[in-house]
């Protein structure tokens, strides 16, 4: 049951992506357009050069905010910088308990923590294929004693929260997107996360998503994420989403909405 609860969060990470629906790329939403999904953050095109996003479902237990800003083109690539901030402490302390909702042992009290991330994104259309390169730096600040035994050793989760134990990390990746028809698109990506010096210092992540666009205001997505990496207990790999009780992988359906304000 503990893993089921936390894999609901992982679903947000699995689908966690002037081009609409391109959260993963250097393209910004058009001004006054918003988009959101069951697991995706709410995104809003504030201006022609600035887009912001928040995860509304998690905001009150894990305050978060992201800002994407367009930059000058480089070698024909559309470029943008992205900055993220997250305060995970309230949620982590919520799950530091015994029983069904407990994932972290109750003897651990998580101190105030702040996560910062800065990324550089470059996108370009090549022969009908949208290519995006990204890379950046992650910083984790713990304002108090953070016990190293309190790590959550689960795929996707460990290497994202590990930055608070390691103080810093690096991420880089490649995204390839192609529309195979007017309404159907395919997204394939490969991402690497590094936590130099930490036990369990890397995670290699691959994702495949297929989307059906009913209109510019609604789409349905399904797919999987494959994770391979090092953890405190050794090497591991997993196909996600994963249902622990059934000991099986199942595809997950994501619904997304969008609208342009006049």
Ranges and model annotations:
Residues 3-13:
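Sec-dependent N-terminal signal peptides
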Residues 14-18:
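Boundary at the C-terminal end of the N-terminal hydrophobic targeting segment
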Residues 20, 62-169, 173, 226-229, ...:
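Outer-membrane pore/translocation modules
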Residues 22-25:
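Blade/loop signatures of beta-propeller domains
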Residues 27-42, 46-59, 65-67, 79-87, ...:
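Transmembrane beta-strand segments that form the barrel wall of outer-membrane beta-barrel proteins
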Residues 47-49, 72-74, 127-129, 179-183, ...:
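Outer-membrane beta-barrel channels and translocator barrels
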Residues 176:
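Cysteine-nucleophile amide-bond enzymes
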């Amino acid at each position: 049951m503990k893993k089921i609860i936390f894999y609901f969060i992982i679903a947000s990470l699995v689908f966690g992506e002037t081009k609409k629906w391109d959260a993963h790329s250097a393209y910004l939403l058009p001004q006054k357009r918003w988009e959101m999904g069951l697991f995706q953050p709410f995104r809003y095109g504030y201006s022609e050069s600035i887009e912001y996003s928040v995860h509304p479902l998690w905001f009150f237990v894990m305050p978060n905010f992201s800002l994407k800003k367009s930059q000058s083109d480089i070698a024909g690539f559309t470029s943008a910088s992205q900055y993220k901030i997250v305060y995970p402490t309230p949620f982590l302390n919520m799950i530091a308990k015994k029983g069904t909702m407990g994932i972290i042992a109750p003897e651990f009290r998580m101190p105030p923590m702040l996560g910062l991330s800065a990324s550089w994104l470059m996108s370009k259309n090549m022969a009908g294929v949208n290519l995006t390169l990204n890379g950046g730096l992650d910083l984790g600040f713990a304002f108090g004693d953070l016990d190293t035994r309190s790590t959550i050793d689960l795929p996707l989760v460990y290497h994202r929260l590990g930055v608070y134990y390691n103080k810093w990390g690096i991420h880089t990746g490649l995204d390839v997107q192609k529309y195979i028809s007017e309404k159907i698109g395919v997204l394939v990506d490969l991402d690497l996360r590094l936590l130099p010096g930490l036990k369990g210092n890397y995670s290699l992540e691959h994702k495949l998503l297929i989307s059906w666009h009913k209109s510019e205001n609604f789409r349905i997505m399904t797919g999987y994420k494959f994770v391979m990496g090092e953890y405190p207990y050794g090497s591991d790999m997993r196909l996600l989403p994963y249902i622990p009780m059934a000991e099986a992988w199942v595809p997950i359906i994501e619904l997304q909405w969008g609208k342009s304000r006049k």
